[in-house]
């Protein structure tokens, strides 16, 4: 425990405590920095409805807040109807979002300074094609074949939001900033007192995305920092590398340039550390911890993490949030794929001089397949098919032009194929294409009050080309003598693209 506290103090002593230049007057918070740190223009906050607000507007809103004594009203009367005197009631949901987004920009300044202050020799060249989500899968394919066990971790989130404020106290010495943060959290917890705490957190996350991301990343960064400490204490092997997973390809070359960094404040998705026996990858609200060794070792790590969350973050997490599985006998959900490392039998013919014999061996293979049930569920929710996968028309789109209908269906189909091109089994993808193509035909037939067969005959090959994916275009150029769809389903090669930087592209087009 003494080592743990000493390690913690050493980490905190490195923090550059940044007294925020907020208090220009007794009660006015204003921005003193351009967020880009390169100019003097006021910071602009982009809201969800694409309106921009400058720091001057935020300053005026805070003055009005104090003039109307809203601090007392919000605590004493949290359930008053905000729609009754809307013009005089300042702290509406709209203004609350402006202030919280502005506050999030200000508290991110020290962490932006920390990134800018990194030595030039440690900088990593950033290339757009190296940020692809797909580039993590070749890394897993290369490393996971030699590991035994995998822990699938759902990173718990503290129910009490005061814990997040306490974590920031180590990094932020500006007391009024912390009071303002508590005010935001208090306001939403009071206003949502009639619902559960988890729903309150969800509402706060939805309405204050930037501030919530900052709080969540602060918590995750603290958790991963001490996870690194546990890793160092549990093994006599030196840590090979750790760092922000900025680029996710050419791993062996990049390992030489990585220094120890503490991520999370620029909305980065992935972070990792690795050594010959252990690999850690975090994505969204989950993490994967894979390693060699015995099952008992994995249970010790599970116990470490549960006790760590309980005694350091002061909240109890359920043991079922950490699943320990043997890689050879299980699959795991990762970035929209069901991945596994099965042992496949391989028959090898060996010949020595005049004698030949067969060797039956087993080889591990990193397998990625498409979760068919999940994707059909998305299509069903978007009313492209029934729950069992039977295509139906989309009545809400019948008012659009024929070209717009074809373009929307074709774009959804191409997005699904593009993201799941790394699947080792293409049959599910062609089933999804069939559902979307027939749903499109039924939508057009419904619009023109015709039958599906008649409309298909009228459009001909132009209708099929709209659903012709980029992957199939590549194969059609390679196999020019084949017919248009003769190669469909005949190849099982996985294709990983280097231009996919968001997993949300899978679901967003359906909504």
From Swiss-Prot:
**One Pfam family, short name:** MatK_N
Which GO cellular component does the record give, naming just one? chloroplast
Which keywords fit this entry according to its UniProt record? Chloroplast, mRNA processing, Plastid, RNA-binding, tRNA processing
Its subcellular locations are: Plastid, Chloroplast
Q: Which organism is it from?
A: Hordeum lechleri (Wild barley)
> Could you tell me one molecular function GO term of this UniProt entry?
RNA binding
- InterPro entries in alphabetical order: Domain_X, Maturase_MatK, Maturase_MatK_N
Q: Which HAMAP family match?
A: MatK
Family statement drawn from the similarity comment of this UniProt entry: Belongs to the intron maturase 2 family. MatK subfamily.
Could you tell me which cysteines form disulfide bridges? none
What this protein is reported to do is described as:
Usually encoded in the trnK tRNA gene intron. Probably assists in splicing its own and other chloroplast group II introns.
Q: Which GO terms describe its biological process?
A: mRNA processing; RNA splicing; tRNA processing
Its protein name is Maturase K
């Amino acid at each position: 425990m003494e080592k743990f506290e000493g390690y913690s103090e050493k980490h905190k002593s490195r923090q550059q405590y940044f007294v925020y230049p907020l208090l220009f007057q007794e009660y006015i918070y204003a921005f003193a920095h351009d967020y880009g740190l390169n100019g003097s223009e006021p910071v602009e906050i982009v809201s969800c409805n694409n309106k921009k607000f400058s720091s001057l507007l935020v300053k005026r809103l805070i003055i009005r807040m104090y003039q109307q004594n809203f601090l007392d009203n919000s605590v004493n009367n949290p359930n008053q109807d905000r729609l009754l005197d809307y013009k005089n009631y300042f702290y509406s949901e709209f203004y609350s979002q402006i202030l919280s987004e502005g506050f999030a920009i200000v508290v991110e300044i020290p962490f932006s300074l920390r990134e800018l202050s990194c030595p030039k020799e440690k900088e990593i060249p950033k290339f757009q094609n190296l940020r692809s989500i797909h580039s993590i899968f070749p890394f897993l394919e290369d490393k996971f074949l030699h590991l035994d066990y995998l822990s699938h971790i759902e990173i718990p989130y503290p129910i009490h939001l005061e814990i997040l404020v306490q974590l920031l106290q180590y990094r932020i010495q500006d007391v009024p900033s912390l009071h303002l943060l508590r005010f935001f959290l208090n306001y939403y917890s009071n206003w949502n007192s009639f619902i559960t705490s988890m729903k309150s957190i969800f509402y706060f996350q939805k309405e204050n995305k930037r501030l919530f991301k900052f709080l969540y990343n602060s918590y995750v960064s603290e958790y991963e920092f001490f996870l690194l400490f546990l890793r160092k204490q549990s093994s006599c092997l030196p840590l090979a590398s750790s760092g922000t997973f900025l680029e996710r390809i050419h791993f062996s070359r990049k390992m030489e340039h990585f220094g120890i960094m503490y991520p999370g404040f620029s909305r980065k998705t992935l972070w990792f550390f690795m050594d010959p026996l252990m690999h850690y990858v975090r994505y969204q609200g989950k993490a994967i911890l894979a390693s060699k060794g015995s099952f008992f070792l994995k249970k010790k790590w599970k116990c470490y993490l549960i006790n760590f969350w309980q005694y350091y973050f002061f909240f109890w997490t359920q043991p079922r949030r950490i699943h320990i599985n043997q890689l050879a006998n299980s699959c795991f959900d990762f970035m929209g794929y069901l991945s596994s490392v099965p042992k496949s039998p391989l028959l090898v013919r060996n010949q020595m001089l005049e004698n030949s014999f067969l060797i039956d061996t087993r080889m591990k293979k990193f397998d990625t397949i498409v979760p068919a049930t999940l994707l059909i569920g998305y299509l069903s929710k978007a009313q492209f098919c029934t729950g069992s996968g039977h295509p139906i028309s989309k009545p809400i789109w019948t008012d659009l032009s024929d070209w717009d209908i074809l373009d929307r269906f074709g774009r959804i189909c191409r997005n699904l194929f593009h993201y799941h091109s790394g699947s080792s089994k293409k049959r599910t993808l062609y089933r999804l294409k069939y559902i979307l193509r027939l749903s499109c035909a039924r939508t057009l037939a419904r619009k023109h009050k015709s039958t599906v067969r008649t409309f298909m005959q009228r459009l001909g090959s132009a209708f099929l080309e709209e659903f012709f994916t980029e992957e199939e275009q590549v194969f059609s150029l390679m196999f020019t003598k084949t017919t248009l769809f003769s190669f469909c389903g005949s190849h099982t090669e996985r294709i990983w693209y280097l231009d996919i930087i968001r997993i949300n592209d899978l679901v967003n087009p359906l909504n």
